[in-house]
């Protein structure tokens, strides 16, 4: 086993942490990490276990001290869908983002499903109870995004530059170029906001078009997020179901050049894994980068429960080279642990980072593939307690993998490893000790 150099060290003793980094009953995808007052806050949408669509729960928040990313605290509900004042076709809160304004208050940007309206809520603290403020609008007071000819408003990413300028990014680029209301879906776009955090200085303009120069299957799809690192602007985005990618520029609003893939929770792009032959069940993706104690991390999500609607947050440490390049990081079980997990101890099965059935082929109907695939799930209904997920549907041809563990103390896995199973496992499980 080859352990990447960036996860070999452990700077200080602390409780171990796994992927997913939140309790297994918590389904928070689309995570935007931000540091306020020496705490790392995660703002994301909120899936419901056994839900029938994306983001069925209200916004909640978790945070951890920057000096111990294993010590996550539940901050509670920060915004309820019933606070949204408009009647919508589907009152579902899609992926949000948060920024601290120049006035010291915290602004939450969000879009209700299919509304194409970017709304804003405000709070005096980073994880208090946000109150609806208004909708993003043009100088003449018109709410932008709801008329034919507007760009579709979706997945806000909000960013404050060093000079205090605030930029709002959005965009959606499926196969069709406009929705049923004539609103345009042609790529990622940006506008600059006035100090009221609602009014645009100018109409949005495209920064990454549909026909952008990039490798196959790496074009912009959704999930806009902006970061500035060492003078370089990094636009992080999702390229459909093959991971989080990035583009760079010397400007926040133009001239972006494709950089590469940062992370795929299915390891697509590494070791020969592809969309049709992934290391873990794949689907959409959304997240961003944060610097904590001189290390950089990518926050993303993975899938569970054999569905697209039970997503969980995962994170990995990344390396940004002197020239600004980010190499793709693999999906692991240890994530924020900043090093391999101890080979001594008991670990829950749900921290698996590879789940496959080697008998599945790409030409199989989706329904047949789902029947054969093992998956991570839980018993009971959606809840806020009970860290008891497990792997279900293990059968002949299935493989589950975990990375990484520290065997430096001459631990012999043949003599010391036990696999504790549930009633859901039939027949026997063989473990393979390989390097």
Q: Where would I find each of the regions flagged by the language model?
A:
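Carbohydrate-active catalytic/glycan-binding domains of CAZyme proteins
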Residues: 2-425, 430
């Amino acid at each position: 086993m080859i352990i990447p150099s960036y996860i070999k060290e452990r700077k200080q003793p602390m409780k171990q942490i796994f992927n997913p980094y939140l309790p297994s009953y918590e389904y928070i995808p689309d995570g935007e990490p931000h540091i306020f007052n020496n705490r790392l806050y995660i703002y994301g949408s909120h899936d419901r276990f056994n839900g029938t669509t994306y983001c069925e729960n209200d916004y909640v928040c978790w945070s951890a001290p920057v000096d111990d990313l294993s010590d996550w605290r539940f901050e509670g509900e920060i915004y309820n869908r019933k606070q949204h004042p408009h009647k919508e076709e589907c009152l579902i809160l899609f992926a949000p983002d948060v920024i601290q304004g120049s006035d010291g208050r915290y602004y939450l940007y969000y879009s209700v499903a299919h509304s194409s309206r970017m709304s804003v809520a405000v709070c005096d603290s980073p994880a208090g109870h946000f109150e609806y403020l208004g909708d993003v609008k043009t100088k003449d007071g018109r709410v932008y995004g709801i008329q034919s000819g507007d760009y579709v408003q979706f997945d806000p990413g909000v960013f404050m530059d060093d000079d205090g300028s605030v930029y709002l990014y959005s965009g959606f680029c499926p196969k069709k170029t406009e929705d049923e209301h004539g609103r345009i879906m042609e790529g990622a776009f940006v506008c600059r906001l006035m100090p009221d955090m609602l009014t645009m200085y100018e109409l949005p303009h495209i920064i990454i078009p549909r026909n952008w120069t990039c490798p196959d299957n790496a074009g912009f799809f959704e999930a806009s997020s902006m970061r500035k690192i060492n003078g370089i602007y990094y636009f992080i985005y999702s390229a459909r179901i093959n991971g989080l990618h990035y583009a760079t520029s010397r400007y926040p609003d133009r001239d972006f050049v494709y950089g590469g893939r940062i992370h795929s929770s299915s390891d697509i792009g590494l070791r020969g894994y592809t969309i049709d032959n992934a290391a873990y069940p794949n689907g959409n993706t959304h997240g961003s980068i944060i610097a904590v104690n001189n290390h950089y991390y990518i926050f993303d999500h993975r899938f569970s429960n054999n569905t697209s609607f039970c997503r969980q947050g995962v994170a990995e440490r990344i390396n940004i080279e002197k020239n600004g390049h980010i190499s793709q990081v693999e999906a692991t079980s240890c994530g924020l642990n900043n090093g391999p997990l101890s080979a001594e101890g008991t670990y829950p099965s749900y921290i698996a980072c590879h789940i496959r059935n080697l008998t599945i082929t790409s030409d199989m109907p989706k329904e047949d593939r789902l029947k054969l695939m093992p998956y991570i799930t839980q018993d009971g209904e959606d809840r806020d307690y009970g860290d008891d997920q497990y792997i279900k549907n293990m059968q002949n041809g299935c493989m589950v993998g975990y990375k990484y563990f520290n065997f430096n103390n001459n631990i012999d896995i043949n003599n010391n490893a036990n696999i504790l199973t549930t009633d859901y496992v039939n027949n026997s499980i063989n473990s393979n000790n390989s390097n």
